[in-house]
Amino acid sequence: MWQNIIFVGLGSIVGGVSRYFISEWSRHLFPSSFPWGTFIVNIAGCFLLGLLSGFFTSHPALVYRLFFTVGFCGSFTTFSTFSFENLQLLSNKAYGLFSLNIGLSLILGILFAGLGYLMTNK
């Protein structure tokens, strides 16, 4: 158990630092009001989580899977997990749950982000 926690933590450190560097790099490379850094890490994270999930299907080394998928991708972007879970819902033909997850996540995510902002910036 502790070994798994350590691997998730180490992956999280690497993922979070990677996200920071990519966000800073993109801010200098693409100066605009569009959030390029977030966009890049979210799309790259989705691709990476898809690759890793496919790889670990045939190479089920738990600590490495935890390091890369839960730790790295989890701190690099949570959008990757959201996207992959929706892909699984589509694969299972759970179209109602797919629609519900996307709709509620987007609407409630924006509402709660706004609520949190309003609570701290009156």
Segments (PLM) and residue ranges:
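Membrane-interface helix-loop junctions in multi-pass transporters/channels
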Residues: M1-K122
